[in-house]
């Protein structure tokens, strides 16, 4: 008995039963990946998917983004039925596309169309990273190019929200061609006096960051967005140097002159409205000359 006093007792942890776990339905709570605070999902959604504790910007899907910037009921979608095929017969590509269509209820990684911001007509494209990580394949490039051409025809500004892992590897050179195609369409729009606003969200990388995302008349970004071409580890191994902690963040790019502004999501619609308002007179004068 005396010996038992000196024996280290085992510590046990209570493991929640399945019944306890089921008391909180899926989707009710959201954990912030930055500050780790657990919040009611409805509270996060009400705050435009921005953490109420630390300001972290959670990813938005395409429809949430459109709802946050456009006048209610003003959006009209373009090219909704366009879908990707498998021209290079890449293994399992069709199955992955179909899986993403079911998961996201989208046909591709970008939604394009027209709508109004404070009654000012714009053509808008919004990339959705849930679909193949927002990668740019031939259909994504085609939809963006067509949207730019529509903005040119309507003589209205073009706005894009980017969120992409870059070119889509399953489409090879056909994917890389979209970098040139979209850039040429934007050049035509620009030469005619058209306004182009690019808003980079997390993440904007690879061929998307190296093409249309970076050539706006105004280049904006959301706080903390990862923006860059190659990955951090690849660059460090190439230059054999340790990169700054904030390298490839929106704030780093702003400090080094690659962005015009970092705009909080709460202020995005108003910032776009002000830019559009400033360019209304000048832009129309160019179109009509």
From Swiss-Prot:
Cofactor: Zn(2+)
Catalytic reaction list: N(6)-carboxybiotinyl-L-lysyl-[protein] + acetyl-CoA = N(6)-biotinyl-L-lysyl-[protein] + malonyl-CoA
InterPro entries: AcCoA_carboxyl_beta, Acetyl_CoA_COase_Trfase_b_su, ClpP/crotonase-like_dom_sf, COA_CT_N, Znf-ACC
Listed EC numbers: 2.1.3.15
Ranges that cross the membrane: none
Gene3D superfamilies to which the protein is assigned, alphabetical: 2-enoyl-CoA Hydratase, Chain A, domain 1
Subunit and partners: Acetyl-CoA carboxylase is a heterohexamer composed of biotin carboxyl carrier protein (AccB), biotin carboxylase (AccC) and two subunits each of ACCase subunit alpha (AccA) and ACCase subunit beta (AccD).
Official protein name in the record: Acetyl-coenzyme A carboxylase carboxyl transferase subunit beta
Name of the gene encoding the protein in the UniProt record: accD
């Amino acid at each position: 008995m005396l010996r038992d006093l000196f024996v280290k007792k085992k510590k046990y942890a209570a493991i929640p039963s399945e019944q306890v776990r089921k008391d909180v339905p899926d989707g009710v709570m959201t954990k912030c990946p930055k500050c780790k605070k657990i919040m009611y999902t409805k509270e996060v959604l009400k705050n435009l998917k921005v953490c109420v504790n630390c300001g972290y910007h959670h990813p938005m899907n395409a429809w949430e983004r459109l709802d946050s910037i456009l006048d209610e009921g003003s959006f009209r979608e373009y090219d909704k039925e366009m879908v990707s095929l498998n021209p290079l017969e890449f293994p399992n590509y069709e199955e992955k596309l179909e899986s993403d269509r079911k998961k996201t209820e989208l046909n591709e990684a970008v939604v394009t169309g027209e709508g109004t911001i404070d009654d000012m007509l714009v053509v808008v494209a919004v990339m959705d990273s849930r679909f193949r990580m927002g990668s740019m394949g031939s259909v994504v490039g085609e939809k963006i190019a067509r949207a730019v051409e529509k903005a040119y025809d309507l003589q209205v500004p073009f706005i894009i929200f980017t969120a992409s892992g870059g070119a889509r590897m399953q489409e090879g050179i056909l994917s890389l061609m979209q970098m040139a195609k979209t850039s040429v369409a934007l050049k035509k729009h620009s030469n005619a006096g058209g306004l182009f606003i690019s808003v980079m969200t997390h993440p904007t990388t690879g061929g998307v960051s190296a093409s249309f995302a970076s050539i706006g008349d105004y280049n904006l970004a959301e706080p903390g967005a990862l923006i860059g071409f190659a990955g951090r580890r690849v660059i460090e191994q190439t230059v054999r140097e340790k990169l700054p902690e904030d390298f490839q963040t929106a704030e780093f790019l702003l400090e080094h002159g690659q962005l015009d502004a970092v705009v909080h999501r709460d202020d995005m619609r108003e910032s776009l409205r002000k830019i559009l308002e400033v360019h209304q007179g000048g832009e129309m004068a160019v179109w009509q000359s």
